[in-house]
Swiss-Prot record:
Cofactor binding note from Swiss-Prot or TrEMBL: Binds 1 NAD(+) per subunit.
GO cellular component terms given for this protein: cytosol
This protein's UniProt keywords: Cytoplasm, Hydrolase, NAD, One-carbon metabolism
Record-linked PROSITE patterns: ADOHCYASE_1 (PS00738), ADOHCYASE_2 (PS00739)
Top-level lineage group: Bacteria
Functional pathway: Amino-acid biosynthesis; L-homocysteine biosynthesis; L-homocysteine from S-adenosyl-L-homocysteine: step 1/1
NCBIfam families reported for this sequence: ahcY, PRK05476.2-3
Cofactor dependence: NAD(+)
Binding annotation for NAD(+): 165-167, 199, 228-233, 251, 300, 321-323, 369
Record protein name field: Adenosylhomocysteinase
């Protein structure tokens, strides 16, 4: 357990209120007890100091759970500088506790867009000069993009990037395809212990929590439309169904759509015959006019466009649980309709105030579970952040930046961690639940063609 220290002689941070540090520390202590995989890694590798010499730039939601991640990285030898990857997701008491522990952190809930970029750049620089960072831990890809575009000289010294989320992985793969990615990256998002836990089970827990905190609405008996049925969509649909909502799914992928059907959801489209004509008359007004709640979950752009927003039932709640705020056309809403703040991250959007024709928009179209609530529980984030620690160790050990220049191109990649590491995280999580895993006998292992200690499934196995 890290101790609070005097910050009188430490000013390398900016948080909302440093006096919240004691509260944050109490919650961090509780979270540690709910993160068995991360804490097991901390104790297993503490003596070895595998991250000694690592200087990590971190840009991920500055929550209580992230504080446990940060202190695990520090316990394994790393230095870190931190910012949040979303203007609304910081928990101010968590940021204060990390600052009070002597870790440079620049994050507060309710940043402006300009402040958000400023915070990222404060992690990149120290005393006005680029910090001698050699590792990156990112969520969404904004830090990675700023480094490549504005601080390219720093990439000569960086061994790799570990990326947390679907959106960030898409950006990395796009950079790789275009020849723009200058350092290797580990795709943490597609580790099973991240994608199934965080994306699916985490959203199952946190979406309904956020909507109820924001609106105080009863959800049972009302109609919901979930846009997307990937892992985030699956968890989101389950979250609303367990509240008693009547849930329908919109999908572009026939495999995901088939899964939705098999899970008992009706697959529909917000467009007539599923075709987006780019015009108001192409919208399925009958569907949208009876929808009480619309949730976007895709990581794609404009999946709830202006024509859908115009057609939605008056009083409908609109929110997003994908990474960025461009899934819902909030620009159109700002340019054309009157906004009235009810409380932080809850706005009434008047399409016609005289007629009280309105929508309820949560978190301004950004991540609703972190804007209107506290995100996923510690036990969920345990798997994600254990993978982040292993990814940082994996990349730091391989020392990409120290390779001869002619060897670097063939060592660029975006890849997931080896399956055995994924299984290691899962094992620690099961042990944290008090579960007992059965061990294969040697004849059994031979029969199915695996080692007794794993890995147990081929890399292309679909869990």
């Amino acid at each position: 357990m890290a101790q609070l220290q005097s910050v009188d002689n430490f000013s390398d941070y900016k948080v909302k209120d440093i006096s919240l540090a004691a509260w944050g520390r109490k919650e961090i202590d509780i979270a540690e007890g709910e993160m068995p995989a991360l804490m097991t890694l901390r104790e297993k590798y503490r003596a070895q100091q595998p991250l000694a010499g690592a200087r990590i730039l971190g840009c991920i939601h500055m929550t209580i759970q992230t504080a446990v991640l940060i202190e695990t990285l520090v316990a394994l030898g790393a230095e870190v500088r931190w910012s949040s990857c979303n203007i609304f997701s910081t928990q101010d008491h968590a940021a204060a506790a990390i600052a009070a522990a002597g870790v440079p952190v620049f994050a507060w809930k309710g940043e402006t867009e300009e402040e958000y970029v400023w915070c990222i750049k404060q992690t990149i620089t120290k005393d006005g000069q680029p910090w001698n960072a050699n590792m990156v831990l990112d969520d969404g890809g904004d830090l990675t993009e700023i480094l490549h575009n504005e601080f390219p000289q720093m990439l000569d010294h960086i061994h790799g990037i570990s990326e947390e989320t679907t959106t960030g992985v898409h950006r990395l793969l796009d950079m790789m395809k275009k020849g723009e990615l200058k350092v290797p990256a580990v795709n943490v998002n597609d580790s099973v212990t991240k994608s199934k836990n965080d994306n699916k089970y985490g959203c199952r827990h946190s979406l309904n929590d956020a909507i109820k905190r924001a609106t105080d609405h009863l959800l049972a008996g009302k109609k919901a439309l979930v846009i997307g049925y990937g892992d985030v969509g699956k968890g989101s649909a389950a979250s609303l169904r367990q509240e008693g909502m009547i849930v329908k799914i919109s999908e572009i992928d026939p495999i995901c759509a088939m899964q939705a059907c098999m899970d008992g959801y009706e697959v529909v489209s917000p467009y007539i015959d599923g075709v987006n004509t780019g015009a108001a008359d192409g919208v399925n007004r009958d569907l949208l006019g009876h929808t009480d709640l619309l949730v976007t979950t895709t990581g794609n752009v404009n999946v709830c466009d202006k024509y859908m927003l115009q057609a939605l039932k008056s009083g409908a709640v609109v929110c997003n649980i994908g990474h960025f705020d461009n899934e819902i056309d909030t620009r159109f809403m700002r340019d054309n309709w009157e906004w009235e703040e009810v409380k932080p991250q809850v706005h009434v959007i008047y399409r016609n105030k005289d007629q009280n024709d309105h929508l309820l928009l949560l978190s301004e179209g950004r991540l609703v579970n972190l804007g209107n609530a506290t995100g996923h529980p510690s036990r969920i984030m345990d798997g994600s952040f254990a993978n982040q620690v292993l990814a940082q160790m994996y990349l730091f050990e391989r020392k990409f930046a120290d390779l001869p220049a002619d060897e670097k191109p063939k060592n660029l990649y975006v890849r997931v961690l080896p399956k055995q590491l994924d299984e290691e995280v899962a094992r620690y999580m099961v042990q944290g639940f008090g579960g007992v895993i059965t061990k294969l006998t040697q004849p059994q292992a031979k029969y199915i063609g695996v080692e007794v200690e794993g890995p147990y499934k081929p890399t292309d196995y679909k869990y």
